[in-house]
């Protein structure tokens, strides 16, 4: 059987562009351990242009081919694509819509599921409809005096709030507000990232994560891992990726009862199946001191950097990432 031509697409030009490049390197190294794939990695820039790592411009056509601007390079037929793009246009579902249009099989969640999870307002409506408890919130559709008053009222009721751009990556356009006088400026910043904003009650709780993925025909939910931040910080974009980050990650959370651990995993699977996710996800929860479980968010294309939790939790669960990729891809294209 000849190798399949696998397009590894990364970048996107957004706030998480560089993280996407790091994740793509993990995919490259994992795919290289198999003899089933011929891999072409392309970077998508902020202008929507595709190019190779050495700068050759190209395009993905509706004939499922990569055609190069330089006519001396022959067209490259694409059998399968991994859209390793965090944020727009990957996790938003936009690029998946194009793949569907040209009937190109791809890795990861489909367009509607991606869009529903990426928008924090839509996601919360789904969580509630599925009976999965989540953090108390209000949402705002424009920056005006009424929005500021609503947020100030929420602050008065809850004592502290998180203000989040509704349609950005998990830590992009996200601000913790402990001083009421800062609300107007924070809202202005959040609205610069997205047309809708979510204001959530600050939850003082443990931050737990579950890797949920499909493998050998089953939906797998790992034991919860934990993000442990300094008491004066939250898991912001900088805390995730800065070299001097004070945060640490535990692949398996300590001091978690079997009953609570299983309930978190059950909620994660319920959300995965109910929202019709596919292939992979990282589902994040809060656990309060009185054992209240709250779903925080779903990441439909979690990071795969050296510090990322998803690949570590998958491996800790006893699965090999390369074998996992072969299994998922083999459900869609013939690898025999």
From Swiss-Prot:
PANTHER family named in the record: D-ALANINE--D-ALANINE LIGASE, D-ALANINE--D-ALANINE LIGASE A
Encoding gene per record: ddl
Listed name of the protein: D-alanine--D-alanine ligase
Main subcellular location of this protein, as a coarse class: cytoplasm
E.C. no: 6.3.2.4
Cofactor list: Mg(2+); Mn(2+)
GO MF annotation list: ATP binding; D-alanine-D-alanine ligase activity; metal ion binding
Enzyme class: ligase
GO terms, biological process: cell wall organization; peptidoglycan biosynthetic process; regulation of cell shape
Residues at which Mg(2+) 2 binds: 297, 299
Reaction catalyzed: 2 D-alanine + ATP = D-alanyl-D-alanine + ADP + phosphate + H(+)
Binding site for ATP: 154-209
């Amino acid at each position: 059987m000849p190798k399949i031509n696998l397009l590894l697409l990364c970048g996107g030009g957004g706030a998480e562009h560089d993280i996407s490049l790091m994740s793509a390197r993990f995919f490259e190294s994992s795919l290289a351990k198999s003899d089933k794939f011929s891999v072409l990695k392309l970077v998508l820039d902020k202008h929507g242009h595709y190019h190779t790592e050495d700068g050759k411009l190209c395009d993905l056509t509706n004939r499922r081919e990569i055609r190069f601007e330089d006519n001396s390079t022959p067209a490259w037929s694409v059998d399968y694509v991994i859209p390793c793009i965090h944020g727009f246009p990957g996790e938003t579902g936009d690029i998946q819509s194009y793949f569907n249009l040209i009937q190109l099989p791809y890795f990861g969640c489909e367009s509607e599921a991606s869009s529903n999870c990426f928008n924090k307002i839509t996601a919360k409506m789904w969580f509630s409809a599925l009976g999965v408890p989540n953090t108390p919130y209000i949402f705002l559709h424009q920056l005006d005096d009424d929005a500021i008053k609503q947020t100030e009222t929420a602050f008065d009721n809850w004592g502290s709030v998180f203000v989040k751009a509704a349609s950005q990556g998990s830590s992009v356009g996200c601000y913790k507000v402990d001083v009421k006088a800062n609300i107007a400026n924070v809202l202005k910043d959040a609205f610069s990232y997205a047309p809708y904003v979510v204001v959530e009650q600050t939850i003082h709780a443990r931050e737990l994560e579950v890797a949920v993925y499909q493998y050998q025909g089953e939906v797998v939910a790992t034991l919860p891992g934990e993000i442990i931040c300094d008491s004066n910080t939250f898991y912001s974009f900088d805390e995730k990726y800065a070299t001097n980050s004070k945060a640490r990650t535990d692949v398996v959370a300590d001091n978690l009862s079997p009953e609570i651990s299983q309930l978190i995993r059950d909620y994660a699977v319920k959300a995965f199946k109910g929202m019709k996710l596919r292939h992979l996800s990282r589902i994040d929860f809060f656990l309060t001191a009185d054992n209240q479980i709250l779903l925080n968010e779903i990441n439909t294309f979690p990071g795969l950097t050296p510090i990322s939790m998803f690949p570590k939790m998958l491996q800790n669960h006893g699965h090999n990432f390369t074998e996992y990729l072969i299994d998922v891809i083999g459900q869609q294209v013939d690898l025999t």
